[in-house]
């Protein structure tokens, strides 16, 4: 995918300034991602630090729009100035495609890292945004669970692989397949935050129950406690009575995890993914783009606060 261009209004929104604050010598009709990065440096407009988050998008139920959501979320974080690594865990390579690339064009995937001990840095690819990198996936990833089975410490392979590169990134986003196996167990063990995209239907409850049981078992058996679990209602249509009833049920049974932001049903969102473009490139003014931005606005203060607490604890322990 070619690098997008942005208007002065869009650039000002990303930088958190008014268009008039953009230096006159830097003003132009269309800005590239590199132009924006230079402006960030000139104006010193970098976002609040998040403390190297590792965030997993996962639901054991398929068809929830998870990949469209995770890739557009990662893209938008990068537009806002965060250094982001998107890791495609699904052998179908949909996250790779949503960034405008074909998985088959890449020789190496995460399989090479987890099984063949290839350094993760050698598998990471550059996207059309200077601060968004990705790890591609293709059908070779379909054998990763089987290959991990006989290995010692198999559930920690991904966490260990990240150690050499995660300091370069504010956020690592994992896009996982809708299944439970060793690869997704690795992702859960590596993650700080879990995003669970759901549709407003009662079938989603079955997947949620199993997922939360899995999270609880990780806490009890492997002593891994997630910092945050965010349930995100995706593709919501308020004209459907059943959708409203399902949303009310989610609010009743999972109030502490359910994000107040709802991603409304948006044709342009789905179309953008099929075209291999994040919704913020295809139509930044669409309902899908606005709702994902609202979701980010909702969770960022929590993540910034968590990073500040962690930094304080680290300083106290060092002292």
Curated annotation (Swiss-Prot):
Protein location: Cytoplasm
Disulphide bridges, residue numbers: none
Effect of residue 90 to A: Lack of activity. Cannot complement the deletion mutant
Primary location class: cytoplasm
Record key words, sorted: ATP-binding, Cell cycle, Cell division, Cytoplasm, Nucleotide-binding
GO BP annotations, alphabetical order: cell division
GO terms assigned for molecular function: ATP binding
Disruption phenotype: Deletion results in division defects with the formation of filamentous cells and chromosome-free minicells. It causes reduced formation of Z-rings and incorrect positioning of the few Z-rings formed. Deletion does not affect chromosome replication and segregation. Inactivation affects adventurous (A) gliding motility.
Transmembrane segments: none
SUPFAM superfamilies given in the database record: P-loop containing nucleoside triphosphate hydrolases
Protein's UniProt keywords contain Cell division: yes
Gene Ontology annotations for the cellular component aspect, listed alphabetically: cytoplasm
Binding site for ATP: 61-68
Source superkingdom: Bacteria
Pfam family, one: AAA_31
InterPro entries per record: AAA_dom (IPR025669), DNA_Partitioning_ATPase (IPR050678), P-loop_NTPase (IPR027417)
Family: Belongs to the ParA family.
Matches recorded under PANTHER family: COBYRINIC ACID AC-DIAMIDE SYNTHASE, P-LOOP CONTAINING NUCLEOSIDE TRIPHOSPHATE HYDROLASE
Function: Spatial regulator of cell division that is involved in identifying the incipient division site, recruiting FtsZ to the division site and stabilizing the Z-ring. Binds ATP and GTP.
Binding partners and assembly: Interacts with FtsZ in pull-down experiments.
The protein's name in its UniProt record: Cell division protein PomZ
Gene: pomZ
